[in-house]
């Protein structure tokens, strides 16, 4: 699968078509917005929805960890959808997840994780990683030279022709942040159009496709 390498200052980041971010320097894999247990939350509220959504999220995550062999997996918030969806079966899976992924895991707490306790996976606050400021919701980094990397927004881009219109997940860069928003990883997540102020890289099939590539960009730049 074709990834896109993007540089921010001294940081070299890989946009992966699996909707994940790879930091080669210390072999860190980042994903956001898995929203596990979402189907069970809908079912509890009387909305019929099949329960296989979590497998459609977790199996690709395990495949990704097997392929890239990260030393650390950072979950940028909203690991679960709501406490109501935290079944015992899901708790068992989450307890085993570090072993299944074969690496250490860190959860930066998101708004959907609030009030939920996950054994062995305490929620951590926003934090620095090199020149990056990692958070769930968009934040202003404490150091103006840092790049905020976050989730929460579930960014998608609209691609339109005369006869068709597609909405594709994307990596979205806002130079005014400066901020990089990564796409939602979960199978049962929607998306929000990130708008023209963002430079966008579309997740299209098994490739990353630069979009609006002429967007002004002071420090971030794409490389082949």
Spans of features found by a protein language model:
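Extended recognition/assembly regions associated with phosphoester-bond processing machinery
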Residues: 1-76, 81-224
């Amino acid at each position: 699968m074709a990834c896109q390498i993007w540089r921010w200052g001294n940081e070299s980041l890989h946009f992966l078509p699996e909707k994940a971010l790879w930091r080669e320097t210390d072999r860190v894999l980042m994903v956001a917005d898995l929203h596990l247990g979402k189907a069970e939350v809908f079912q509890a509220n009387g909305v019929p929805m099949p329960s296989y959504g979590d497998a459609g999220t977790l199996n690709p995550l395990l495949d990704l960890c097997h392929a890239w062999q990260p030393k650390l997996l950072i979950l940028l918030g909203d690991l679960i959808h709501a406490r109501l969806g935290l079944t015992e079966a899901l708790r068992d899976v989450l307890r085993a997840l570090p072993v299944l992924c074969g690496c250490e895991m860190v959860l930066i707490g998101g708004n959907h994780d609030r009030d939920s306790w996950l054994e062995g996976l305490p929620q951590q606050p926003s934090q620095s990683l090199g020149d990056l400021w990692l958070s769930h919701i968009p934040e202003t980094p404490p150091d103006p030279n840092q790049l905020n990397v976050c989730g929460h927004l579930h960014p998608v881009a609209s691609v339109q022709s005369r006869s068709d219109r597609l909405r594709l997940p994307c990596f979205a860069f806002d130079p005014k942040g400066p901020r990089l928003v990564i796409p939602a990883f979960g199978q049962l997540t929607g998306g929000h159009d990130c708008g023209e102020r963002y430079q966008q890289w579309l997740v299209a099939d098994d490739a990353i496709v630069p979009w609006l590539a002429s967007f002004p960009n002071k420090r971030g730049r794409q490389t082949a």
